[in-house]
């Protein structure tokens, strides 16, 4: 090793020892013929002082981010010069030798200053030298180790599943890779290890896990990445409670890393209750502001807007004094989410109701409205009316925005919940409208994925009454983020084929795309279930950052572009020809047999 000690490890107990450090010049300061540098390595920072003529002249050459090796004696800092803000603030190293290992070009941005995201991603290797970004990646490594420790303790087997497989419809678009030896044919990068982990259960592995790379070619909404990571888990001979218990053990180990003890068992809420009370299937429970049902209250209203299948409300405390411009902004807020607007009523300090909606209500409706929704003088009541699902979703968004604007969310709080009993299917048009891919050609598509088992009480009726069928599924939510989702899987061919039929996937298509799984079910497939944690989101929460890019070593920008390598990039004509990307495959050729040149 070039060094004897890590810079961040030095303490007063090291005083008098000769040490050799290696790292980067974080800062240089000249004081009356003496030069100080903050030497930074992965462990932290130590102050180095250059007093001796032999090294002083060399030290004058040092600039920010020069890579150096320094030898000297650890000394306690003079009285009054200690720095209590850093762990090594009681000592300094009196340098006797200095070696410049490599110089640095002028920096594109100062590492101790704020920089734009584009510059940070383009020079990510510099960005990661900073304490915050570097520590986020190190915390992710600790999270990996903590999860592996829990799973190893339960005798799970870590298995790597293929990253070159066939394209199967799973709810998003595949990234495709041309197969050079079979011109016109393509591999697909996996959207998840779902099918392979189920096959591992058929294979008798019983307990599997993998920190898996996954790929989805989708429109890049806020904070999405084309490649992402899951902690993927599958177990045989289990029910929902078994998987949840293991998942909670992992969560406890993870949050122990940041000094928080997750209380277990974690509360559960049904999907229906979550939507009714919070307008979201991933509710943030760090604050109240529950939705209020108003459908029955306005059942005989003459106000046409409220003559709807569903009417609901959410109260904004103190919101009655919002200026007109702000209230108009709420209309734009609703329109951005696909709604015509957001109705509101202002409760005056004397209890009278104001605003355009109040004028259209009957005296009886006005008199009892504040009490019905729990509004006080000075509050604003927001309403949404229409189809229950979309109206509740809008109110859920309003609820979150109100909490943000009013500072109702404790940034240091943690609130976990399981959301269970979600629908097994949703209308295909709803999935498409939400930006998802509706698998199959039927009127219904799977809410989670096509391999989720119906709950036992829905097993005999899910194909005759798809809208009422419940999934044997469970999602874990933390602070309004879905950080994991799982289900008990289908392990019988007949049930799987019935699910496919509901989704408009014919037996022929099912055999072509999923025949390997269906065939495996014929060989004593055991009951099994599992869960996958969104590892980027989990580690972002642990690191205290709102963006998953902060916990990915080399993330893509919002458009799926890598500013560092400038990927994706065009290929050459020679590469295109060699890959066979334009060739048309011969249908008669057998899989695994190369096409003729």
UniProtKB/Swiss-Prot annotation:
Chain's role: Aspartyl-tRNA synthetase with relaxed tRNA specificity since it is able to aspartylate not only its cognate tRNA(Asp) but also tRNA(Asn). Reaction proceeds in two steps: L-aspartate is first activated by ATP to form Asp-AMP and then transferred to the acceptor end of tRNA(Asp/Asn).
What PANTHER family would the database entry show? ASPARTATE--TRNA LIGASE, MITOCHONDRIAL, ASPARTYL/LYSYL-TRNA SYNTHETASE
Q: State the organism named in the record.
A: Mycobacteroides abscessus (strain ATCC 19977 / DSM 44196 / CCUG 20993 / CIP 104536 / JCM 13569 / NCTC 13031 / TMC 1543 / L948)
Task: Give the domain of life.
Answer: Bacteria
Could you tell me what this protein is called?
Aspartate--tRNA(Asp/Asn) ligase
Asked if Manganese is a keyword of the record, the answer is no
NCBIfam families xref list = aspS_bact (TIGR00459), PRK00476.1 (NF001750)
Q: Where in the cell is it found?
A: Cytoplasm
Identify the stretch(es) annotated as Aspartate. 194-197
Report residue spans for region: Disordered.
558-597
Record's catalysed reaction(s): tRNA(Asx) + L-aspartate + ATP = L-aspartyl-tRNA(Asx) + AMP + diphosphate
Q: What class of enzyme is it?
A: ligase
Q: Where, by residue number, does L-aspartate bind?
A: 170, 216, 448, 489
**Sorted UniProt keywords:** Aminoacyl-tRNA synthetase, ATP-binding, Cytoplasm, Ligase, Nucleotide-binding, Protein biosynthesis
Subunit structure of this entry? Homodimer.
Q: Which GO terms describe its cellular component?
A: cytoplasm
């Amino acid at each position: 090793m070039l060094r004897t000690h890590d810079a961040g490890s030095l303490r007063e107990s090291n005083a008098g020892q000769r040490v050799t450090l290696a790292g980067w010049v974080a800062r240089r300061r000249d004081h009356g013929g003496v030069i100080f540098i903050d030497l930074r390595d992965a462990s932290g920072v130590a102050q180095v002082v250059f007093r001796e003529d032999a090294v002083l002249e060399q030290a004058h050459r040092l600039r920010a981010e020069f890579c150096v090796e320094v030898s000297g004696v650890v000394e306690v800092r003079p009285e009054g010069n200690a720095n209590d803000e850093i762990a090594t603030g009681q000592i300094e190293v009196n340098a006797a030798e200095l070696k410049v290992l490599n110089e640095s070009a002028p920096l594109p941005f100062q590492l101790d200053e704020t920089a734009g995201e584009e510059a940070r991603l383009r020079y990510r290797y510099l960005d990661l030298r900073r304490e915050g970004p570097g520590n986020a990646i190190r915390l992710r490594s600790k999270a990996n180790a903590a999860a592996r420790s829990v799973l190893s303790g339960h005798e799970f087997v870590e298995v790597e599943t293929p990253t070159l497989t066939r394209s199967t419809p799973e709810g998003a678009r595949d990234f495709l890779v041309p197969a050079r030896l079979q011109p016109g044919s393509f591999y697909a990068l996996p959207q998840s290890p779902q099918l392979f982990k189920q096959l591992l259960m058929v294979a008798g592995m019983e307990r599997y896990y993998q920190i898996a790379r996954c790929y989805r070619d989708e429109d890049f909404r806020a904070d999405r990445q084309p490649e992402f990571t899951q902690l993927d888990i599958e177990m045989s001979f289990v029910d929902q409670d078994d998987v949840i218990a293991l998942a909670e053990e992992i969560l406890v180990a993870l949050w122990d890393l940041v000094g928080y003890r997750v209380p277990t068992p974690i509360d559960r809420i049904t999907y229906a209750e979550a939507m009714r009370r919070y307008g979201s299937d991933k509710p943030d429970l760090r604050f109240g502001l529950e939705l209020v049902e108003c459908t029955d209250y306005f059942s005989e209203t003459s106000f046409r807007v409220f003559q709807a299948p569903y009417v609901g409300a959410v109260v904004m405390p103190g919101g009655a004094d919002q200026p007109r411009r702000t209230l108009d902004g709420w209309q734009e807020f609703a329109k951005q989410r696909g709604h015509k607007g957001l109705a509101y009523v202002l409760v005056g300090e004397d209890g009278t109701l104001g605003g355009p909606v109040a004028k259209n209500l009957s005296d009886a409706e006005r008199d009892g409205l504040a009490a019905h929704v729990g509004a006080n003088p000075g509050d604003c009541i927001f309403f949404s009316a229409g189809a229950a699902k979309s109206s509740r979703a809008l109110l859920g968004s309003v609820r979150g925005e109100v909490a943000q604007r009013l500072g109702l969310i404790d940034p240091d709080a943690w609130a976990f919940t399981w959301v269970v009993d979600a629908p097994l299917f949703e209308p295909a048009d709803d999935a498409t409208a939400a930006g998802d891919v509706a698998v199959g050609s039927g009127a219904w598509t799977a809410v989670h994925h096509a391999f989720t088992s119906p709950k036992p009480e829905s097993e005999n009726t899910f194909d005759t009454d798809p809208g009422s069928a419940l999934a044997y599924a469970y999602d874990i939510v933390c602070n309004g983020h879905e950080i994991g989702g799982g289900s008990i899987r289908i392990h019988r061919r007949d049930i799987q084929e019935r699910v496919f039929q509901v989704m408009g996937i014919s037996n022929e298509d099912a055999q072509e795309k999923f025949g390997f799984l269906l065939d495996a079910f014929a060989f004593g497939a055991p009951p099994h279930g599992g869960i996958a944690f969104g590892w980027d989101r989990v580690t972002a929460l642990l690191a205290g950052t709102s963006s998953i890019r902060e916990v990915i070593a080399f993330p893509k920008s919002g458009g799926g572009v890598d500013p560092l390598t400038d990927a994706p990039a065009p290929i050459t004509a020679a590469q295109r020809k060699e890959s066979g990307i334009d060739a048309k495959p011969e249908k008669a050729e057998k899989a695994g047999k190369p096409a003729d040149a």
